[in-house]
């Protein structure tokens, strides 16, 4: 409960199922005033990586031109630490087609800088910890669907989701 959640059912014991929900007092007022809760977290399935990257690049362009977000209000998270750099390089090409400036935190800029005015921030999951943005996109989240140490993969996805200030 110290981090804004309450247990609805189940047990927090290892290997047990549990259902958590956000406490109403732990959610900023603007969440209810300005946002439709059903639109806050959206999931979408893509046939291939380039289709995903192009869709997200278009959405980011819309966020900047129509939704009144500054580029540095937007964070793109790559859950796979191993592939984040190569995935970012491919994703950045899609952003460039829409004249969107970006950086991969700690790789394409100084290590201690996470946000640059006029540029969207992209990050591997561990670099994103402790940093938040009003708008967060999680790309290639399918890497958290199955595999060895599934609980760590799910925690990775949860960490990515909680990088949004709306959370």
Residue ranges, per PLM feature:
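The feature marks helicase ATPase cores and/or their adjacent C-terminal helical subdomains
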Residues: 1-167
């Amino acid at each position: 409960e110290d981090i804004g959640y309450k247990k609805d059912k189940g047990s927090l014991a290892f290997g047990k199922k549990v259902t958590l929900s956000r406490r109403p007092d732990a959610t900023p007022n603007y969440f209810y005033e300005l946002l439709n809760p059903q639109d806050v977290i959206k999931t979408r399935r893509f046939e291939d990586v380039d289709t995903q990257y192009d869709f997200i690049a278009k959405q980011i362009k819309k966020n900047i031109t129509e939704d009144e977000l500054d580029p540095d209000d937007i964070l793109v998270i790559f859950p796979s630490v191993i592939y984040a750099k190569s995935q970012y390089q491919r994703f950045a090409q899609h952003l460039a087609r829409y004249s969107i400036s970006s950086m991969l935190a700690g790789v394409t800029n100084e290590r201690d800088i996470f946000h640059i005015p006029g540029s969207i921030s992209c990050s591997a999951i561990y670099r994103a910890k402790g940093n938040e943005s009003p708008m967060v996109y999680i790309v290639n989240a399918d890497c958290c669907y199955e595999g060895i140490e599934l609980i760590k993969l799910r925690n990775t996805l949860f960490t990515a989701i909680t990088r949004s200030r709306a959370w």
